[in-house]
Amino acid sequence: MKTLLLTLVVVTIVCLDLGYTMTCCNQQSSQPKTTTNCAGNSCYKKTWSDHRGTIIERGCGCPQVKSGIKLECCHTNECNN
């Protein structure tokens, strides 16, 4: 009985994937690609223009942005590249 219970617990943990983290890109503008592990389930890419040209910011989550900033949120690994 204990073996069956232990097996069920292990199967549940594997199926729920409790330790899952999402991988998001976090390089800025045209810098070489870098990634980070995120606890949440989304990545973002913010794009805007200023006196320097087009600026791109990437990271974890899906933040609120001011008007004039384009925001793309996505939900798969490295989807914000």
UniProtKB/Swiss-Prot annotation:
Gene3D superfamilies attached to this UniProt entry: CD59
Coiled coil: none
Keyword field: Acetylcholine receptor inhibiting toxin, Disulfide bond, Ion channel impairing toxin, Neurotoxin, Postsynaptic neurotoxin, Secreted, Signal, Toxin
Keyword Transmembrane helix annotated: no
Compartment(s): Secreted
A UniProt-annotated Pfam family: Toxin_cobra-type
Chief location of this protein within or outside the cell: secreted
One GO CC term, this protein: extracellular region
Keyword Repeat: no
Superkingdom field: Eukaryota
InterPro entries: Snake_3FTx (IPR003571), Snake_toxin-like_sf (IPR045860), Snake_toxin_con_site (IPR018354), Toxin_cobra-type (IPR054131)
Disulfide bridge map: C24-C43, C38-C60, C62-C73, C74-C79
GO molecular function: acetylcholine receptor inhibitor activity; ion channel regulator activity; toxin activity
Tissue expression remark: Expressed by the venom gland.
Signal peptide per UniProt: 1-21
Family listed: Belongs to the three-finger toxin family. Short-chain subfamily. Type I alpha-neurotoxin sub-subfamily.
Role this protein plays: Binds to muscle nicotinic acetylcholine receptor (nAChR) and inhibit acetylcholine from binding to the receptor, thereby impairing neuromuscular transmission.
Name of this protein: Short neurotoxin 2
Species of origin: Hydrophis peronii (Spiny-headed seasnake)
